[in-house]
Amino acid sequence: MARVTVQDAVEKIGNRFDLVLVAARRARQIQSGGKDALVPEENDKVTVIALREIEEGLITNQILDVRERQEQQEQEAAEIQAVTAIAEGRR
């Protein structure tokens, strides 16, 4: 079992409350969103992986926001393509 000291992660994020929010958000992405870990998993739980990513500076709240916006734009573009294909098929 990995031991994680969160002091470095707190320094990267700014305060412990925001750290909890960012780590939880990232852990949910890894667990349910099908996102790959950016650090070796080493049989760690997703919360530990999220904290290690934050500690190494790979994940911040801003990075998560940008990634989510990009994914949303890609999904919207795919939906528009699908609707266009359906509409053209009906002509």
From Swiss-Prot:
Molecular-function GO term, any one: DNA binding
Function: Promotes RNA polymerase assembly. Latches the N- and C-terminal regions of the beta' subunit thereby facilitating its interaction with the beta and alpha subunits.
Protein name (record): DNA-directed RNA polymerase subunit omega
Family label: Belongs to the RNA polymerase subunit omega family.
Complex formation: The RNAP catalytic core consists of 2 alpha, 1 beta, 1 beta' and 1 omega subunit. When a sigma factor is associated with the core the holoenzyme is formed, which can initiate transcription.
EC number of this enzyme: 2.7.7.6
Disulfide pattern: none
One Gene Ontology biological process: DNA-templated transcription
Keywords, alphabetical: DNA-directed RNA polymerase, Nucleotidyltransferase, Transcription, Transferase
Gene3D superfamilies on file: 3.90.940.10
HAMAP family associated with the record: RNApol_bact_RpoZ
Top enzyme category: transferase
Gene name for this UniProt entry: rpoZ
Reactions catalysed according to its record: RNA(n) + a ribonucleoside 5'-triphosphate = RNA(n+1) + diphosphate
